[in-house]
């Protein structure tokens, strides 16, 4: 029997891009291709790129260059593949003319066509060797579940719609089947992702789908309830990311706080507020009522006291005054956001924000970002100290001689904090990766926790 052709794979960018990579790798394995862990062991290399900010563009271009140098046969996909250069030609083909093919994001079919053209598929693919959940690039105990593609918003700082298109929601039955297969495969935590999770179903007018004979609307609240019910059967977690602050988000909070889904639909919201001053939000083309947002955050916490709120912000947006920036700092203090990320505004090629007046010097943008993070760290440290002395449920991610590293319901992988768990004193309390354990919290800083089983 002849040796199977081998494909190397490089995956860059956000969790949405990671899911695209998983889908491509799943299809490659289904058709009998092997995945190579090295450039020199591969017959060709696929690079899945990111093109959102300048640093990501450069990282992607460097990765393509490295793959060309080390292997020579490279197919490029992802967001950067949809980006044009200043001359109007494809940016990747202009910088790296030797690439075999370039596609945009979410393009499994096009990538496979390119692979077939340059590396014909084997005659006997091993479809049965591919698990029902597909090939995953995350650890076995957690996985990303992408519920839609694209975005209908036109935020002035963002070019995602030009690369990934308008919102396209996946059929609810398809989403539920993937979730079930993931839980069956041993996944303990599903991270629901999209460009705009709250808008799920808008494009299909919230039409009714069916799962196991039950009607389920293509709508975030209904999907979350169905996922919560499924997760409860497996003792697993569901975590919500990229939740745009629509009024409909209010309906999800009770699912986190009470009833059969409590402890399965995690009390965690990743809400990209971006700013708090109405004038800045208006220039960003974002919802512009910070007072109402504060009221909603307070109401959410009344309903669900354990709620963790993560958000991202931009400091130094064009035209942002010192007074407007201070409004943002006040908002972070009053809202007591648990987890916060902040970017100093950086012009993105193709974004309409580039045409706005009032661009700030680099040093002002960076100084504001640093001040913002100081305030955010103070708020986070204060909230983290409240957890000392409590016993929390922790999902173990790593185990070593010095103990384990895990996460609570308040911590998403990669972006939030962790819990450092002491080694188990008794054999009966030993734990392994993917286990849920009860941990008494003994210490905290602004980001992480320490505890013992």
From Swiss-Prot:
Q: Where in the cell is it found?
A: Cytoplasm
Q: Which GO terms describe its molecular function?
A: 4 iron, 4 sulfur cluster binding; aspartic acid methylthiotransferase activity; metal ion binding; protein methylthiotransferase activity
Domain (TRAM): give its ranges: 385-453
Q: Is Cell membrane one of the keywords UniProt gives this record?
A: no
- The broad enzyme category this protein falls into is transferase
- Top-level division of the source organism's lineage: Bacteria
Give the cofactors, semicolon-separated: [4Fe-4S] cluster
According to its UniProt record, the EC number is 2.8.4.4
Cofactor binding note of this UniProt entry? Binds 2 [4Fe-4S] clusters. One cluster is coordinated with 3 cysteines and an exchangeable S-adenosyl-L-methionine.
Domain (MTTase N-terminal): give its ranges. 5-120
> Is RNA-binding found in the keyword set?
no
List the catalytic activities from the record. Answer: L-aspartate(89)-[ribosomal protein uS12]-hydrogen + (sulfur carrier)-SH + AH2 + 2 S-adenosyl-L-methionine = 3-methylsulfanyl-L-aspartate(89)-[ribosomal protein uS12]-hydrogen + (sulfur carrier)-H + 5'-deoxyadenosine + L-methionine + A + S-adenosyl-L-homocysteine + 2 H(+)
Write out the residues that bind [4Fe-4S] cluster 1.
14, 50, 79
What's a Pfam family this protein contains? UPF0004
| Record domain Radical SAM core: where | 137-383
The residues the record assigns to binding [4Fe-4S] cluster 2 are 151, 155, 158
A single Gene Ontology biological process assigned to it is: tRNA modification
Alphabetized UniProt keyword annotations: 4Fe-4S, Cytoplasm, Iron, Iron-sulfur, Metal-binding, S-adenosyl-L-methionine, Transferase
Record-linked InterPro entries: Elp3/MiaA/NifB-like_rSAM (IPR006638), Methylthiotransferase (IPR005839), Methylthiotransferase_CS (IPR020612), Methylthiotransferase_N (IPR013848), Methylthiotransferase_N_sf (IPR038135), NA-bd_OB-fold (IPR012340), Ribosomal_uS12_MeSTrfase_RimO (IPR005840), rSAM (IPR007197)
In the UniProt record, the signal sequence range is: none
Q: Name the GO cellular-component terms.
A: cytosol
User: Which HAMAP family does UniProt cross-reference here?
Assistant: MTTase_RimO
Q: What does this protein do?
A: Catalyzes the methylthiolation of an aspartic acid residue of ribosomal protein uS12.
Q: Which family does it belong to?
A: Belongs to the methylthiotransferase family. RimO subfamily.
Indicate what this protein is called per its UniProt record: Ribosomal protein uS12 methylthiotransferase RimO
Whose protein is this, by species? Burkholderia cenocepacia (strain ATCC BAA-245 / DSM 16553 / LMG 16656 / NCTC 13227 / J2315 / CF5610)
